[in-house]
Amino acid sequence: MKNETKLKKLVGWLDKNNIEYRCPSKEMSKYKRKKRSDLFIPKFVISVRIDDDYTQKWYRAHYDMNPVVIRDTDTPRFLIKKMQNTITRVMVNQQKYYMKEHDKKETKSNR
């Protein structure tokens, strides 16, 4: 199965679950497209890219944006599972951050 088809299945899954996404590379020139992700989910700050020659540099540059790479060996089911795990990890990290901030505010107000 082609990687573009896997990306379309992932987009279908995102639509089904009402998760907003953007496809920034479709509007770009060929040079800029090389450096951009194929799909971006702003709510969870997740970047998705189809595997190619530039992927390693892209991964290092976008490491803080929770990168997900679509490889030739991935099945659509595995890709969706990988996306679910990434979304879950981001949500847990956000919750930890909010709880930490809430604790800071409480200790500050108790002084």
Language-model segment annotations:
Residues 1-111:
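Nucleic-acid endo/exonuclease domains
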